[in-house]
């Protein structure tokens, strides 16, 4: 499974490399903000300048992936074929490795048959193939860490080894440095673990404190760096209110309308340049809160649309939107089918005596996307949930076939 998954993604990477060599907007498609920050690191200016001009230190993104891209640039020479292929190869490796936790997660919660089918399904999973081989971004690494986190959380339910808690804390710390949104389910999963281990008569408080200390030790250097750079407590990143502003500004022509982001709006970019990063983020907070207070109905309506978009891929049938997004309708059918199969698989498992095993995964499915409902949603943002979705999609199909055969 692993080698097939890797080969498919590497083949797509080889085809997609020319896309990243386009000099449009100074190689903007080469990692977007992450590519700009990586170049700044290589040029000796540090973790800075996420947009088009030098703008000083930034905390708009977490550090792990930009430094990874910077390492590739340092080795292979900036925006080159070799650099693009190196980054895409790493993406492909991360995505292919995700087969392993997918297999063991399915085996632990469901059964061996589902684990094998889910592993092979992941090898050919379109979103994973595209996000690994068709984008220079952190999606594949984020998904790998997420799937390892989900698996390690389940292992802790009955584990007596302190080392498992250390690994858990380290994984959460790594998640914070790669994609802080992964930390969303942490308090809910921690409560679930405390309840489950208490029922089993197993210790949870001190091992949990130790895991929390490991997490803090992993992210602390980055938090200290942010405080020194901005004289403000910024634990991991500072872009939350900008993302809220993008989602709630009155423009629903797209999930992320061009009029609301500094990379696509001359007005927003001019404000960024004038105020600096911290001033800009403060301004977006003020603007977003004011707009939401003045338009509560709009906030509720767009939030509902974000929920629908997260689980079906659907946003709009406006001709101008569809012209810019030619795969929107096919993707909507595919994403909706995946969600329906997910619901079916969860139902089969829950009613089939696996409710306790399934519950923490349901908890993740509910809590992880919450931040995207109140900012803006996207299929790539949902990618950390895709291992769980693929597992239960496969289980739904297999269980339906088994029951149909039993009735025949």
Residue ranges and their predicted role:
Residues 5-8, 115-126, 144, 151, ...:
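Short helix- or helix-capping micro-motifs
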Residues 10-23, 30-57, 64, 71-72, ...:
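Extracytosolic helix-loop segments that constitute the early lumenal/periplasmic catalytic or substrate-binding loops
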Residues 59, 63-67, 77-100, 119, ...:
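Loop-to-helix entry region of an early transmembrane alpha helix in multi-pass inner-membrane enzymes
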Residues 86, 93, 284, 290-291, ...:
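Membrane-interface anchor segments at the N-terminal boundary of transmembrane helices
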Residues 86-110, 148, 340-347:
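Transmembrane-helix motifs of polytopic, lipid-linked glycan transferases
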Residues 109-113, 141, 149-167, 171, ...:
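Membrane-interface transmembrane helices that cradle and orient dolichyl/undecaprenyl
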Residues 166-167, 180-196, 237:
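Transmembrane-embedded, aromatic-rich helix segments that form part
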Residues 227, 233-309:
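Membrane-proximal stem/loop segments at transmembrane-domain junctions that anchor or position
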